[in-house]
Swiss-Prot record:
Provenance organism: Mycobacterium leprae (strain TN)
Protein name as catalogued: Serine/threonine-protein kinase PknG
EC number: 2.7.11.1
Active-site residues from the entry: D289
Pfam families named among the record's database cross-references: Pkinase (PF00069), PknG_rubred (PF16919), PknG_TPR (PF16918)
Taxonomic lineage from the root: Bacteria, Bacillati, Actinomycetota, Actinomycetes, Mycobacteriales
Gene symbol of the encoding locus: pknG
Signal peptide start and end residues: none
Stretches the record annotates as Disordered: 1-32
Entries under SUPFAM superfamilies matching the protein: Protein kinase-like (PK-like)
Keyword Transcription set for record: no
Length: 763
């Protein structure tokens, strides 16, 4: 199946080439259509290759038959989290356009960017005539031509035989050719919009200077730079590139609309491409034109194509890109890492959201009511940071964005599949301990020791358990600080005090330059509850710390300890917006909301737990919220998700039993709930802590319930479900508790209770 022309979507009418003037200049850049794609988009597998078999040579010859490598139909991306169907590479000849015509909707003047060559502009729309394919722009007078400059059969540079057109972009037609000097391998020739465009010619010359050094497995390979005379005899430069036989990420549906990808799939694709951008940035280059059309999915990998817009970082002059994807500040700053990060965010948005369009181009911003953004909160936060109008607030590097994308992907896949996808953070430690795990069962300790126990969560419990920012390995004091990471707060302060006095400075390191050392002191002070000293040190660090998020995190912790929950929420949210793929700020926000009595942020307990089932504090927090909202069934289900391998499994089982029965009148409880609670206790060894008191609780609830209800005859916890049997069970449980009571007074109390509840003896 051959293609008549390129994709018909509306968001990309043409690229813009903007002149990025030096900061001292005042000239505004002009728009120029510079879209540069050299592979059409194939909508589905019906467009893929059906290879014809050549005639067989019947003469006997010695031949080596190459082994055929069979690839599995499914491939895994995103660290193995996402499975996609493997696409087949497309035969080059199948990519040829049978009628290489640029649609009128995509015809723009290369000089001023205004529409040209359109029937409605020439008064021909009524009679059905088409607009002129070449002529002069009615707005600026520049000549334009949308006709191919090369024809099938043309030989370029005495080496490349042109087969035809495969795409058209702002930089002109893109041609398929066969290289006669290298076994007739298929190559791609990318020409320019117009041979008279001096800036475009200069762009091609510039490409020759630095594109040859670009070598990366995720970037299309440049083979050669050649020239060929156009129809007027003027030389036109062409870049000879590797042919990529796949399909772009821009997919069209059967109805002609742009098909959106699942969020997990889109993230997985971008995770494959970000290393290529990181590589370009490392050698001082910016890609400038990331968009779905320029990402090719092949049988074995993803590749960036079309290097026509690549430029040096902070270069000024003619800067190419696509409206709707291009960062707004690029005319002022020139190409930067931040402008590339912006295109990554816009590409993710274009792949997954129904972006608004105007005049056929994507509008800035995001559709906040899009169901994708409301369903995947972390993904929405990531997009907002990537396309922040202030480039300083975007991700600082492709590596940083990749790390956060991976965290968001884990959340998305866990949410979609219901299977936790835990992963290690690159900037936060694991949880140092747990909080709120035994709050609900702790009040049953009154059976054990006779004292009332609080069921309230405290800020200190949270602070000492929360994750903490990891030590920056580039900090001068990092080797010293690594030894104090797991120390107790007092020991940490002693070690840091010794380090400040040079006692640990054996290698002559000037620890006065360290930022991490005072931050470690802040952490230890907060663990000790000394908020005043911690805040004083944070104030001293305000002008020294480049990574402000660390200060914001510790400010939030200090606010939590002082009871300023609104300020703590604000600061934790700021950290979350900076690192949307991290679980640490989500857990902190959920715990802060619980202390404040707010329910808005309880969703983060759910997010953390469903993403990483090793953070059991989140499971118990979610269960507490569900129970408080009257959803005891949901709370029990959450507690049942704690895996048997967790050291808190027993506590979860006991808590679920208490959740079923505690704080409810007998007319709110069913026999099934009583038996369910009993089964949870019965499966645990009697030597486990708190099992005896929970047995007493269950049997006591059953005894009270039976006073007004009828029960089946089956035993419960080894006793008949009768008034006599349950009294025997409660008596036995209380006497067992009396044997392990910590004080004589409480032991006598338990024995008295047992005597009161024992069934009446008959002689």
């Amino acid at each position: 199946m051959k293609r008549e022309h390129m994709d018909h979507d509306t968001e990309d009418v043409g690229q813009a080439a903007q002149r990025a003037d030096p900061p001292s200049g005042t000239t505004e850049g002009r728009l120029q259509s510079t879209q540069a794609i050299f592979r059409p988009n194939f909508d589905d597998d019906d467009d893929l290759l059906h290879i014809s078999v050549p005639s067989v040579d019947t003469e006997p010859q010695d031949r080596i038959t190459p082994a055929t490598r069979v690839l599995p139909p499914i491939r895994q991306l995103g660290g193995g989290l996402v499975e996609i169907r493997r696409v087949r590479d497309i035969d080059p000849l199948e990519a040829l356009m049978t009628n290489p015509v640029v649609p009128e909707s995509k015809r723009f003047c290369w000089n001023c960017g205004r529409p040209v060559g359109r029937s409605e502009l020439e008064g021909q729309e009524a009679d059905g005539a088409q607009g002129a394919k070449e002529g002069w722009c009615p707005y600026c007078g520049s000549p334009y031509s949308f006709l191919p400059q090369l024809s099938p059969g043309d030989i370029v540079a005495g080496q490349y035989e042109v087969k035809g057109c495969i795409a058209h972009g702002g930089l002109g037609w893109v041609y398929l050719a066969f290289d006669h000097n290298v076994n007739d391998r298929p190559v791609v020739l990318k020409g320019l919009v117009h041979s008279g465009d001096a800036e475009a010619q200069a762009s091609a010359v510039a490409e020759r200077q630095f594109l040859a050094e670009v070598v990366h497995p995720q970037i299309v390979q440049i083979f050669n730079f050649v020239e060929h005379k156009d129809t007027s005899g003027d030389p036109v430069g062409y870049i000879v590139m590797e042919y990529i036989g796949g399909r772009s990420l821009k997919r069209g549906s059967k109805k002609g609309n742009v098909e959106k990808l699942p969020v997990a799939e889109a993230i997985a694709y971008l995770l494959e491409i970000l290393p290529a951008l990181s590589y370009l940035h490392s050698i001082g280059l910016v890609y400038n034109d990331l968009k779905p059309e320029n990402i090719m999915l092949t049988e074995e990998q993803l590749k960036l194509i079309d290097l026509g817009a690549v430029s040096r970082i902070n270069s000024f002059g003619c800067i190419y890109g696509t409206p709707g994807y291009q960062a707004p500040e690029i005319v002022r700053t020139g190409p930067t890492v931040a402008t590339d990060i912006y295109t990554v965010g816009r590409t993710l948005a274009a792949l997954t959201l129904n972006l608004r369009t105007r005049n056929g181009r994507y509008m800035d911003g995001l559709p906040e009511d899009d169901p994708v953004l409301t369903t995947y909160d972390s993904f929405a936060r990531l997009l907002h940071r990537a396309i922040n109008p202030d480039p300083r607030r975007r991700f600082s590097s492709a590596e940083e964005m990749s790390a956060q994308l991976m965290g968001v992907l884990r959340e998305v896949v866990a949410q979609d599949t219901g299977v936790p996808r835990a992963g290690l953070s690159t900037i936060f430690s694991p949880s140092r301990s747990t909080f709120g795990v035994d709050l609900l069962v702790a009040h049953t300790d009154v059976y054990l020791d006779g004292r009332l126990h609080s069921e309230k969560l405290t800020a200190k419990d949270i602070v000492t358990a929360l994750q903490v920012p990891l030590v920056d390995p580039t900090d001068v004091a990092a080797p010293v600080l690594q030894a104090t990471v797991l120390s107790q707060p007092v020991q940490t302060l002693d070690s840091l005090r010794a380090a400040r006095h040079g006692m640990l400075d054996a290698q002559g390191i000037d620890l006065a330059e360290s930022v991490e050392l005072p931050l470690m002191e802040v952490r230890a002070l907060l663990d000790l509850g000394d908020v005043v000293k911690a805040n004083r040190k944070l104030d001293d660090l305000a002008d020294r710390v480049s990574c402000q998020w660390r200060l914001v995190w510790y400010r939030a912790v200090a606010d939590l300890l002082t009871g300023d929950y609104a300020s703590a929420t604000k600061h934790f949210t700021e950290v979350l917006n900076t690192f949307p793929g991290e679980l640490a700020p989500k857990l902190a926000l959920a715990a802060t909301a619980e202390l404040a009595g707010e329910s808005d942020e309880h969703k983060f307990y759910r997010t953390v737990w469903h993403t990483n089932d090793g953070v059991v504090s989140a499971a118990f927090g979610l269960a507490r919220f569900q129970s408080a909202e009257g959803d005891r069934t949901g709370a029990v289900c959450t507690l049942d998700e704690v895996p048997p391998t967790s050291r808190h499994f027993t506590t979860a089982r006991l808590t679920s039993a208490v959740t079923l029965l505690s704080g409810r009148s007998t007319n709110e409880i069913t026999e099934q709930q009583i038996r369910d609670a009993a089964r949870r206790v019965e499966t645990l060894p009697p030597t486990e802590p708190r099992v005896l008191q929970i047995r007493a609780l269950v049997l006591g609830c059953a005894m009270d319930w039976l006073a007004d209800n009828q029960a089946s005859a089956n035993h419960i916890l080894g006793f008949p479900f009768t008034k006599h049997g349950l009294r025997l069970g409660v008596e036995a449980s209380l006497r067992s508790l009396a044997r392990v009571a910590p004080t004589q007074r409480h032991r006598y109390t338990l024995v008295d209770m047992a005597n009161k509840v024992r069934p009446t003896s008959t002689l």
